[in-house]
């Protein structure tokens, strides 16, 4: 019901349109990974067609990965939290505002079934979330309640927050420390098989971003890619939006470091 009310509200409509449009783009890029079937994707897009935002802006002018990704991320959302375990096929968004809420979208389900509000006091009382984790979440999403979903999905988020990856990093990795796509071979040392994440800061407003099908790569690999991008941006960025969903970055890195012998087109 909260989602339905927000969709009809003039203030929140633009924000939701932007967020949901970005979600469509995100899901579309991951159908091959089995997160959602093409049939369900079409049904989902039909439901949201009336509130689609304007197209993603041209990013061919961007000099590096930071600028390119920043141009493509949501400006309205202070935080986005995705389900940590891919097979659950659920996505959680945290919106800005006085009364933020999280919405989960699951395959073959009505999105409105997955809307709930949980206040920060309740979140703080949960176990096994550590004080450190809560502190980091609070600092990343200032002046906004850390809103998550109750029940099953909340447990999955808690599971993720206690993976070896976050335990091994006292602070969440900043955007300049990583690229958000890679291959398991490159991040094998990071621990848990469910550790598929990236954390970033966008512009002057830090944003927590946990992406279920992405793996963090090492800083040397990321630096190498940035050098390639800066030295010959026209060759790397062949067209606007080429790396919008990251698949071409992944292909390039896999080829460059000998994981895939086939040169990307």
Q: Model-found features: residue ranges?
A:
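Regulatory, non-catalytic segments
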Residues: 191-208
């Amino acid at each position: 019901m909260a989602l339905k009310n927000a969709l009809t509200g003039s203030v929140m409509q633009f924000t939701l349109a932007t967020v949901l449009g970005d979600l469509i783009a995100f899901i579309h890029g991951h159908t091959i990974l089995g997160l959602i079937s093409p049939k369900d994707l079409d049904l989902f897009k039909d439901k949201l067609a009336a509130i689609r935002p304007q197209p993603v802006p041209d990013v061919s002018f961007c000099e590096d990965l930071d600028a390119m990704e920043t141009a493509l991320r949501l400006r309205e959302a202070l935080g986005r939290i995705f389900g940590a375990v891919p097979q659950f096929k659920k996505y959680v968004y945290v919106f800005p505002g006085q009364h933020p809420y999280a919405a989960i979208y699951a395959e073959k389900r009505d999105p409105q079934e997955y809307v709930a509000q949980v206040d920060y006091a309740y979140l703080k009382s949960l176990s096994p979330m550590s004080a450190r984790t809560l502190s980091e979440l609070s600092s990343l999403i200032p002046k906004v309640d850390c809103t998550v979903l109750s029940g099953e999905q909340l447990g999955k988020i808690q599971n993720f927050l206690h993976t070896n990856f976050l335990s091994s990093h006292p602070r969440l990795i900043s955007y300049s420390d990583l690229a958000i796509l890679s291959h398991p071979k490159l991040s094998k040392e990071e621990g848990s098989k469910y550790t598929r994440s990236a954390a970033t800061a966008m512009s002057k407003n830090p944003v927590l971003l946990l992406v279920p099908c992405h793996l963090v790569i090492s800083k040397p690999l990321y630096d190498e890619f940035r050098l390639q991008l800066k030295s010959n941006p026209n060759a790397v960025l062949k067209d606007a939006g080429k790396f919008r969903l990251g698949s071409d970055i992944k292909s390039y890195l896999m080829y460059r470091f000998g994981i895939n012998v086939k040169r990307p087109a």
